[in-house]
Swiss-Prot record:
Residues 367-567 form the DhaL domain. It is an enzyme of class 2 (transferase). The keyword Transferase applies. Gene3D superfamilies: 1.25.40.340, Dihydroxyacetone kinase, domain 1, Dihydroxyacetone kinase, domain 2. Its EC number is 2.7.1.209. It comes from Mycolicibacterium smegmatis (strain ATCC 700084 / mc(2)155) (Mycobacterium smegmatis). Disruption phenotype: Cells lacking this gene are totally unable to grow on L-threitol. Keywords: ATP-binding, Carbohydrate metabolism, Kinase, Nucleotide-binding, Transferase. This is L-erythrulose 1-kinase. Kinase that has a preference for L-erythrulose, producing L-erythrulose-1P. Involved in the degradation pathway of L-threitol, that allows M.smegmatis to grow on this compound as the sole carbon source. Is also able to phosphorylate D-erythrulose and dihydroxyacetone in vitro. One of its GO terms (biological process) is cellular response to carbohydrate stimulus.
Amino acid sequence: MTYLLNSPDDFADEAVRGLVAANPDLLTEVPGGVVRSTETPKGQPALVIGGGSGHYPAFAGWVGPGMGHGAPCGNIFSSPSASEVYSVVRNAENGGGVILGFGNYAGDVLHFGLAAEKLRHEGIDVRIVTVSDDIASNSPENHRDRRGVAGDLPVFKIAGAAIEAGADLDEAERVAWKANDATRSFGLAFEGCTLPGATEPLFHVEKGWMGVGLGIHGEPGVRDNRLGTAAEVADMLFDEVTAEEPPRGENGYDGRVAVILNGLGTVKYEELFVVYGRIAERLAQQGFTVVRPEVGEFVTSLDMAGVSLTMVFLDDELERLWTAPVETPAYRRGAMPAVDRTPRTTTWDAAETTIPEASEGSRECARNIVAVLETFQQVCADNEAELGRIDAVAGDGDHGQGMSFGSRGAAQAARDAVDRNAGARTTLLLAGQAWADAAGGTSGALWGAALTSAGGVFSDTDGADEQAAVDAICAGIDAILRLGGAQPGDKTMVDAAVPFRDALVKAFDTQAGPAITSAARVAREAAEKTADITARRGRARVLGEKSVGTPDPGALSFAMLMKALGEHLTR
């Protein structure tokens, strides 16, 4: 568990602030994350790497010469929001375009993708590289659909070295994908991790057993095995990873490997060295040539007791870049050649939002929106622990926390907007952005998009009637479908949202409140029925069979909020 904290809500932000304070020669804090504290050459591509917090030294610990130019930092185990990614890129990019590098998770794909679209509209060349090294999460044929784990380190290290050596954007992107496709990882755990402020881990592993094939967000493994000796654990890791070794003698590969034995949080270095001793024996027995092995903590999962093995199958190019010098707060190797140490003098910051003039009718509607969002905030707070418990069965256990953070951020943004005399449209637009920023993750992106799209139905110059309220809800659900890409039967929020929308349209006559209340009952029934479905999307997809018997937390939270909305409007 986390022993030292001030507030669970502020833990991630305070950790970043302390990291920057400890490394002022390398890092500068900007809205949404960190960038290098020194100037970078004009026209050099920027490598912006990121993801949720809780994985230190990934990702902010890898910003510096020879590696990353910036890192957006999400909340614990939640992807940074699109606006956070956008802010970090605007501060890091210096005329050479940008590579966005992140692990292949649904929330990161959504938020980084939305930021990339906005940046491209502004004329910045953006490339996306999703790390997908975890062999437990998909088949070899679907390698790029796998999730990213400790392979983040070599992929970003190699891409950063290529940029440092003078690669342009096309070349850096090519090298990053090449490194990703040459990287394989496999992990296991002996106990789950505990979120800051929580008293119980997200999952337990029975004494004498280990969870095999786990992720890095507190997800349980794909199966449980008996815990053997250190040598037996080493053999399992080695056999799983080397099963996907490419043929020697093809494409420049001849048995050279970069090897990373990664502790996930509480496995001590001495234990790791015992395991690595056996791995080194196996490598020698099978004729591998080991290039700059690493043993330590590189991509962690808070205090998870676990270990993972990563191998990068090297050719001449990848070996040269893997062994190149690097200087970051958490990862240093060799002596960097002369680099510009000129302190960064300018930073980009978003201008304050201008509030359009609004009519009294629209401002009255905005005040009602605030009341609804405050109701949402209370419902999410009351159900945070239960939603987290349900999510931990096959996911990372952060859904309750994300919904609580998001609804609180949206309610505060709406109050601030109303205090500035905003109308209904502007209030919902700002609330949607705030929900996405505060929550991060997939649910943050989807609820943020839903509120933003709902706001598009309203006007700042006119009031709103009951029909507009129904139209706004339907627009929000359509945005969830469009952005998330899920369909009914995938075991997501959509399984409750689509039946709700259809029932709402059918039940609505002249009063929105009763129709929403009636449709919310349909949504709840649909959410409960997701317990019978095997998850096909999101982090729970990897543990699909484990999700059977437990309803989808996103579908449940949607039904809860629609019930609260109906009750509020019926009063």
